[in-house]
Amino acid sequence: MNIEIIVPGKLSSHLQNVFDFYLKKLKRFANLSVTFTKLGGDVNRESKQVILRREKDEILNKVKNRRFILIDLHGKQMDSISFSKFVENEMLSGELLFVIGGPLGIDDELRKKASLKISLSKMTFTHEFTLVILLEQLFRAFKIINNEKYHY
């Protein structure tokens, strides 16, 4: 299975070890790639809408015409079992594409183009933490799918 995650910005050095840990663990289950796009600009110099529009354009340029799942605070909430069933069903298509919004959120047009919106929590996380949480939940999903213990 191919899994791609598109996220604006860069990963902070303090999260790099956790990111690398889950990338390594997930290699056993899927071909995973993470694409970091440019941030849309400086909020001190430009409006939020201009920045979100730029980020949306960058993301859609990477998405092309593919179906994608948006990680969105207002999306569908699932527990880990439901998410693992979702991933298992998507394995039939051979590809999963996730998009995470940037620090200022998500442009409405990007939200409308998503084939599905999933929320990881009712809480708000930074885009970097969202990436790490998504990686952890993907790893957990594959462990559930393969009927393997998660802890130790």
Curated annotation (Swiss-Prot):
It is an enzyme of class 2 (transferase). The keyword Isomerase does not apply. Its main location: cytoplasm. It holds the Pfam family SPOUT_MTase. Its EC number is 2.1.1.177. Keywords: Cytoplasm, Methyltransferase, rRNA processing, S-adenosyl-L-methionine, Transferase. Gene3D superfamilies: 3.40.1280.10. One of its GO terms (cellular component) is cytoplasm. S-adenosyl-L-methionine binds at residues 71, 101, 120-125. GO terms for molecular function: rRNA (pseudouridine-N3-)-methyltransferase activity. Homodimer. PANTHER family: METHYLTRANSFERASE, RIBOSOMAL RNA LARGE SUBUNIT METHYLTRANSFERASE H. Specifically methylates the pseudouridine at position 1915 (m3Psi1915) in 23S rRNA. HAMAP family: 23SrRNA_methyltr_H. Belongs to the RNA methyltransferase RlmH family. This is Ribosomal RNA large subunit methyltransferase H.
